[in-house]
Each structure stands twice: as structure tokens, then as C-alpha cells.
């Protein structure tokens, strides 16, 4: 899927100016990136020019409002912002960040009871507001494992939504999911619960078993959603290319080019065992860039001035340029062929003063059915075709006629016919 590549943008609000757009759009376009996760402030909108500039370049922003779950921000505070973003062409928004981690909650609120219920009570009003404005709410990424076991957290969320029936959470369900590898190989945990035993929370994985804490977390989440809601969610893989965010550690075992290959491999058309299905919409690398003072800069793919830090990026750009050039050359040659040969395929029939024998019409039916050629009786007209099938019945066309077609550049297929049958 060509449009899967994406990035997480700067983790501050200081890089939404015109100069930033001018710097990063060409870089993102040269990588054929289609998604950009933007950290969205609650007090003011990201400038319209920045949002529309991305969209016009074919890059769809995913706005992430990552304020703490029980902060003072109310849905009403975001009403004007969400309306504006929708009018500017934004489609996807995320509220909160890793709500199964203590850091997502204000001090003292984590230990209070009914954590998942309290999360859902906060979350659903934001979801409703987003949908009222025509936006797609994306369920926030959970921390694999986490301070509240992520599989338990997600399952309870899904069960509560189903029990309440106050909101159809299952319609067009999108999720952001961690794709951190945690130093496991890319196929760790692949297949989800259909292949592996459900892991015991915070316990060492049994010998011969694998768990969900790795690149394939989305497999396990998909199983849970299918089990509870009987639907297939759409996924955005976040923190793509990372071993673990907590330690600012890229996955050294998988290069940028390898991760790109995994992201772009088509389902069912690749030998890669990590091929992603079509419901994985985007793979967002962590991190496009960061300020020099930001610790996240250790794992960014570009420095703050747009210079690649990852060795594989220039090679990948060159690969894209070559592929684009080949596609353009093919398109030009195809249009040139159409201009040189106005007719693609011509069936040249002999002409008699009294008409065409009925058995000739019967014989040419398979050609007409399979090739749908232009049908005619003129050698001169046939010279305008890329391919000519000559129905040479009883030597109606001379060798001179055949040579004339070949000299015109036509690909000639001659059918030699006599009154008894056909010999090719």
C-alpha cells in the first residue's frame, strides 16, 4: 500500500510557521509520506496555512490532543477548533495519550477506583463532538503492558461501550497502536491470540510462547475488538521504527529501508512474513525531527534544519526518484504509441464485390470476441494500427500488401485461409 508512510512531527508547538512548511513539505513529499501526526494545542489552532499546505501536498495530518485524561479541558473548549480543522480538510483526531499509563492522569487521580469507567466518561464526549464535526476519532495509543495492563484496559473499554449502548463506538472504528519492538524481532507475537496463549499480566512469557509486547501489538488488539464488537478496526501504527520510546532507542536490528519495505508491502503479494493487511492505514515513524535541546532528537530521522540523520534516507529517496522516472517514461511511451498508432488492433478482411461470405463472419467471431479489433477492408487504413491481423483468405492479399504493413511499423499476424480450412 503506497500511502502508508508517515511521521510524528516535532513534539512542541513551535514549528507550525510558513518557513517550517517550506522546509518539511518537500522532504516529506520526496519520501512519498502521506501522514503526519501533529501535536495539537488546546488554546489555539495550528495555522490554517500549515494545515492546508500539508493537505494540498497530499499529506494528511492526524491531530493529537494529548492533554491528561482528567485535566480541565472540556469538549466545549475544542468546539471551534474542531469545526475549523474540519473545514480546512482535517479528517483524523486523537484525544489523550496512553491512558493506561500513570503519566496520562493528574497527580492523585490514578489510584481512584473505576479507572476505565472514568476514562470512558471523559473520552466519549470528545468522540461525539469530533463526529458532529465530520471528523474521525482515533482511539489513543495504549502503552503495551503499561501501568494498567493494556489488554485488560482495552477489553474493559470495549465491553463497557457495548453494555452502555449509548454510543455506537463500533462504526468506522480507528485505533492508534504502538509498534515499538521492545528489542523483539518483527514477527514477535504475530498471529495474536489465535496463535499464542493470552499472556499473564506482568509475568515472564512462558517458554515457547510469545506475547503482544512488540511490533505486532495491533494483532492482539484486533482480536479483542473482533471478540467483543465483532468488527475489524482500522489501525495507525505509531512510534514506527522504535525499539522503545522510554529509552529513546531506535530498533538497530531493522533499518529505515527495511521498515519502509514492511510498510509498503501489499497484502498477499509479498514474501515478507510481516506483510500488513489493508486495514493498517498508516505507519508513522518516530520521529521526523526535534529541536536540538529536545531529548527526542536522539531518535529523529532529520535534524532541525532538514538534513537526514539516517543513512538509509538518501538511498530511499534515490530509489523513489528512479521509480518515478520509470513510471513517467512508461506513461510518455504509452502516449507516444497512442499518437503514432491511432488504432491499436485492426482486423483486415478481404473485400469482394458481392460482399463477405457468411462462413468468414462465423470464423472471425472468436477474434472479435477476444480482441475487439477495429474491422476494415483497407490496407492503407490498416497501416495506422499497432497490430494488424490479416485475414488472408484465398490469397486475397499479396506479399506486397503484407510488406507494406510491416514497413509501416505494424505488428502483422497473418491468417492464411483457404476454402477448406485455416492454416497458420
Label each region the model flagged.
Residues 58, 121, 214-277:
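Catalytic-core region of carbohydrate-active enzymes that cleave or remodel glycosidic bonds
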Residues 7-21, 34-49, 67-77, 100-102, ...:
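Acidic-and-aromatic substrate-binding clefts and catalytic sites of carbohydrate-active enzymes
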Residues 1-43, 60, 329-374:
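Boundary/entry segment of secreted carbohydrate-active catalytic domains
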Residues 330-424:
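Extracellular glycan-binding segments that recognize GlcNAc-based cell-wall polysaccharides
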Residues 5-19, 24-27, 53, 247-339, ...:
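Aromatic-rich peripheral "rim/lid" segments of glycoside hydrolase catalytic domains that contact
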Residues 38, 63, 97, 139-143, ...:
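Aromatic- and acid-rich polysaccharide-binding/catalytic face
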Residues 41-43, 49-151, 382, 396, ...:
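Substrate-binding cleft of extracellular glycoside hydrolase catalytic domains
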Residues 69-81, 100-116, 188-201, 243-252, ...:
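Surface-exposed, active-site-proximal loop segments in enzymatic domains
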Amino acid at each position: 500500500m503506497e500511502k502508508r508512510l508517515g511521521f510524528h512531527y516535532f513534539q512542541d508547538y513551535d514549528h507550525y510557521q510558513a518557513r517550517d512548511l517550506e522546509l518539511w513539505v518537500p522532504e516529506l513529499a520526496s519520501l512519498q509520506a502521506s501522514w503526519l501526526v501533529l501535536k495539537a494545542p488546546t488554546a489555539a489552532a495550528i495555522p490554517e496555512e500549515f494545515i492546508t499546505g500539508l493537505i494540498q501536498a497530499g499529506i494528511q495530518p492526524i491531530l493529537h490532543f494529548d492533554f491528561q485524561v482528567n485535566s480541565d479541558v472540556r469538549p466545549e473548549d475544542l468546539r471551534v477548533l474542531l469545526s475549523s480543522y474540519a473545514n480546512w480538510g482535517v479528517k483524523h483526531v486523537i484525544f489523550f495519550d496512553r491512558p493506561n499509563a500513570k503519566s496520562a492522569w493528574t497527580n492523585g487521580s490514578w489510584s481512584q477506583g473505576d479507572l476505565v469507567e472514568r476514562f470512558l466518561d471523559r473520552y466519549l464526549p470528545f468522540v461525539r463532538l469530533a463526529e458532529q464535526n465530520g471528523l474521525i476519532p482515533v482511539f489513543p495509543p495504549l502503552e503495551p503492558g503499561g501501568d494498567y495492563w493494556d489488554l485488560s484496559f482495552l477489553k474493559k473499554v470495549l465491553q463497557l461501550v457495548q453494555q452502555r449502548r449509548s454510543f455506537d463506538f463500533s462504526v468506522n472504528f480507528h485505533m492508534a497502536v504502538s509498534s515499538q519492538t521492545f528489542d523483539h524481532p518483527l514477527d514477535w507475537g504475530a498471529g495474536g491470540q489465535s496463535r499464542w496463549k493470552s499472556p499473564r499480566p506482568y509475568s515472564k512469557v512462558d517458554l515457547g510462547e510469545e506475547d503482544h509486547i512488540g511490533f505486532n501489538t495491533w494483532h492482539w488488539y484486533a482480536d479483542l475488538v473482533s471478540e467483543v464488537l465483532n468488527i475489524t478496526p482500522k489501525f495507525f501504527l505509531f512510534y514506527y521504527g522504535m525499539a522503545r520510546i522510554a529509552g529513546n532507542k531506535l530498533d538497530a536490528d531493522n533499518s529505515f529501508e527495511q521498515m519502509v519495505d514492511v510498510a509498503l508491502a501489499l497484502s498477499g503479494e509479498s514474501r515478507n512474513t510481516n506483510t500488513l493487511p489493508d486495514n493498517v492505514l498508516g505507519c508513522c515513524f518516530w520521529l521526523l525531527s526535534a529541536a536540538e535541546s529536545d531529548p527526542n532528537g536522539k531518535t529523529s530521522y532529520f535534524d532541525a534544519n532538514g538534513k537526514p540523520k539516517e543513512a538509509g534516507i538518501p538511498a530511499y529517496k534515490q530509489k523513489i526518484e528512479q521509480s518515478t522516472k520509470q513510471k513517467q517514461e512508461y506513461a510518455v511511451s504509452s502516449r507516444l504509441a497512442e499518437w503514432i498508432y491511432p488504432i491499436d488492433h485492426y482486423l483486415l478482411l478481404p473485400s469482394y464485390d458481392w460482399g463477405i461470405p457468411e462462413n468468414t463472419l462465423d470464423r472471425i467471431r472468436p477474434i472479435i470476441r477476444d480482441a475487439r479489433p477495429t474491422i476494415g477492408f483497407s490496407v492503407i487504413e490498416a497501416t495506422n494500427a499497432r497490430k494488424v491481423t490479416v485475414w488472408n483468405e484465398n490469397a486475397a492479399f499479396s506479399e506486397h500488401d503484407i510488406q507494406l504493413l510491416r514497413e509501416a511499423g505494424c505488428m502483422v499476424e497473418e491468417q492464411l485461409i483457404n476454402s477448406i480450412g485455416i492454416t497458420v
